[in-house]
Amino acid sequence: MSTSTLSDGSLDEGTFAAEDVSGVIEDYFFEGAEKLLEIWFDKNQNGATSLRNIPYSELVSMLDIAQCRILHSKSNECMDSYVLSESSMFISDFRIILKTCGTTRLLHAIERILHIAKIYCNMDNVVSVFYSRKNFMHPEKQPYPHSSFETEVDYLEEHFAGGSAYCIGPQRQDRWFLYTMVTPQAVFPFPEHTLEILMNGLPEDVLSTFSPNVSKDGKDCRMKSAINTILPPDIVVHEELFSPCGYSLNGLIPHSDHYITIHVTPEPDFSYVSFETNQHTLNLCEQMLKVLEIFKPSKFLLTIFTNELSNEGKKMQKNLWDLKICGCRRTNLQFLELPTETLIYVQFERIKSAEQVTCKEVFDR
């Protein structure tokens, strides 16, 4: 096991990852890894209302710029959830989360987001920004500015001043990119944490479930894949089983702005699954292990952001730091201290001699 250092040096990811997909048919490829943008606005700004006041038609126009569209939505008293043609969007009073896969142009939507927040919500003071993604298998297929993290950072800096950019992971292996901007006005007086699991190299018997040939609809897919076992019992879900294959699920925890989102790219040559949540209902450690047991990835990375007020998040960070998984070896472990949060980042890969990824926790729950 080697632990590489966190670096904000070279941000060019190159095309090295394409070596892992030599069997891909050249005229068909889909980039499952998402671009993830989270923007917090100042809730104390004079006259500020709610981002949920933005008209639906304006959201549609904004997503047109990003080159994706809304398939369906659900709401509770705290948040609106949207399953998109390429991943997800969540909007609460002062935060928007936009997560898009494929060759979407997510960062091009920033200017429109800022514009409609000002027009419809009287908000023009951004207090916190997070943008992150895993390295792409084929960055050369991405539109500007997404073909390299360096150009993405330049683009972000055109809209948000004073940010920091990080590249975490070995130069010639899977890596994770993070851009953050936090102002002194960014105060979060409540427990906050976010867990993300990004998985590659899934077995074909797992992947086959996420197709209309095996599952008749999203609910059937959720039950056959056992995804239902990793969801809180009172969660409100909406989901999409795509044709010819693929799956997305958003879930809202009642009476809160907590969510779960899952996205599956099931083509064997470039399989990818993401799981993300900020839920406080279930034990995060147990949930993480169930996710890994369901999808059985050959490679995966985990991140957990937490602030000082989240005991569950801090506990999860400690557990990730000490985590050992039977059948896997840890290839990277990092800690990053940010102005309002801390981050633990860890990567694992399956040991080739192991028949499957068997997840056994060796830490206290």
Curated annotation (Swiss-Prot):
- Give me the Gene Ontology terms describing cellular component: cytosol
Q: How does it assemble?
A: Heterotetramer of two alpha and two beta chains.
Q: Does the keyword Kinase apply?
A: no
UniProt cofactor note: Binds 1 pyruvoyl group covalently per subunit.
Task: List site positions: Cleavage (non-hydrolytic).
Answer: E86, S87
Q: What class of enzyme is it?
A: lyase
**Enzyme Commission number(s) of this protein:** 4.1.1.50
Catalytic residues (UniProt): E31, E34, S87 (schiff-base intermediate with substrate), C101 (proton donor), S248 (proton acceptor), H263 (proton acceptor)
Keywords (alphabetical) are: Autocatalytic cleavage, Decarboxylase, Lyase, Polyamine biosynthesis, Pyruvate, S-adenosyl-L-methionine, Schiff base, Spermidine biosynthesis, Zymogen
Descriptive protein name: S-adenosylmethionine decarboxylase proenzyme
User: Where is the organism placed in the taxonomic lineage, from the top?
Assistant: Eukaryota, Metazoa, Ecdysozoa, Nematoda, Chromadorea
Bilayer-crossing residues are none
The post-translation modification note in this UniProt entry reads:
Is synthesized initially as an inactive proenzyme. Formation of the active enzyme involves a self-maturation process in which the active site pyruvoyl group is generated from an internal serine residue via an autocatalytic post-translational modification. Two non-identical subunits are generated from the proenzyme in this reaction, and the pyruvate is formed at the N-terminus of the alpha chain, which is derived from the carboxyl end of the proenzyme.
Pfam families from the UniProt entry: SAM_decarbox
- Keyword field contains S-adenosyl-L-methionine: yes
| PROSITE patterns listed in its UniProt record | ADOMETDC
- Pathway named in the protein's UniProt entry: Amine and polyamine biosynthesis; S-adenosylmethioninamine biosynthesis; S-adenosylmethioninamine from S-adenosyl-L-methionine: step 1/1
Q: Which residues carry this modification: Pyruvic acid (Ser)?
A: S87
Annotated GO biological processes are: spermidine biosynthetic process; spermine biosynthetic process
What cofactors does the UniProt entry give for this protein? pyruvate
Which PANTHER family does the record match to this protein?
Answer: S-ADENOSYLMETHIONINE DECARBOXYLASE (PTHR11570), S-ADENOSYLMETHIONINE DECARBOXYLASE PROENZYME (PTHR11570:SF0)
Give the family this protein belongs to, as stated in its UniProt record: Belongs to the eukaryotic AdoMetDC family.
Q: Which residues form the signal peptide?
A: none
What is the species listed in this Swiss-Prot or TrEMBL entry? Onchocerca volvulus
